[in-house]
Amino acid sequence: EVMTRLRYPKDFAKRVVWLVSRHMRFAPMMFTKERTLTRWVRTEAAGGEFRTSKDLTEAFSQLKEVFLADMGATHAGNNPQLMAEGRELADAVIEIARNKMPVHTADLAVNGADLAQIITDGAETGIFLKYLLERVRSGNLPNERAALLEAAKHRQQKTTAKAES
């Protein structure tokens, strides 16, 4: 609300609110494993705040800077090892966002044209893409063209078999 009154652009204000509301999330993550980090990034990717993986990665890069500045303002600022651990943690989260967490179906290694050869009902293309997106986000499927096409073929076979029953 303050950002709006000060006439900052809406997207900028939303990003500032996102950064402020999440900058303390990093601290407890220093004691967790990659699965917890992945779950956090997955939640943010699916939350509707970001349109692309690039936006998500940019936001986490900015969050890293806020987190490190916050750490530097505390006793951790005098502890180079602790600051290095914080930097490594933030880099790990950015890496997950950049390489393992698609935000939108457009971030997948396949598109509707690729699936047209597999799907018998073109109206279901969006459903298949969302299915593949969820599989990649969950870590059950790599975001690689061959793996996605194989998963789509398998899903189409199951759908066809179910319809024939």
Give residue ranges: language-model regions:
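Conserved, hydrophobic alpha-helical core segments of structured domains
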Residues: 1-81, 163-165
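Charged substrate- and nucleic-acid-binding regions of tRNA-handling and nucleotidyl-transfer enzymes
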Residues: 74-165
